[in-house]
Amino acid sequence: MRGTEWREARDRVAEMFRKAGIALTPSELEKVEVADFGLGNLAVQGLQLVTYINTDRYCAKELALFPHQTCPEHLHPPVGGDPGKMETFRCRWGKVFLYVEGEPAASVQAAVPPGSEAYYTVFHEIVLTPGEQYTIPPGTKHWFQGGPEGAIVSEFSSTSRDEFDIFTDPKVERMPVIEFDD
């Protein structure tokens, strides 16, 4: 990902948080993580994150999804003696379509990214609007997509070890690489 794309995404995130009435400090805005998952199409498969804290006991983040942007299917595996990350998603703004293991929805509201259909395998649908939340157990495959306006989701979890996430799509690279051009 180019530095200009990161800056544009960060600026969009800042505007989304302003519209949602969620304050971020200048320091937090400078540290927005923009993940295109190495797939090169941030608008379709990507995620923007602000990590408030991540210790060996707990983690708190904000996840920002642009309209119809999808975080690819993945799970949080056991690491050492830890059973894997347990996380609660609480929608703060917009709408998010969350898909987990379980009985598939008769009609899925989100759109699986074209060309990636083979890598989306769970379709138990949870739709979150502001104030609603859902807890994802450790080791559970899941993926999520922003609604028509996008979404801001607060994540409360056990320790986050994103570098160990297992994605269904083997092309995904979880840790973003940014090439600054200035």
UniProtKB/Swiss-Prot annotation:
Optimum temperature is 70 degrees Celsius. GO terms for molecular function: D-lyxose ketol-isomerase activity; manganese ion binding. The keyword DNA-binding does not apply. Its cofactor is Mn(2+). Mn(2+) binds at H74, H76, E87, H142. CDD domains: cupin_YdaE. This is D-lyxose ketol-isomerase. It comes from Cohnella laeviribosi.
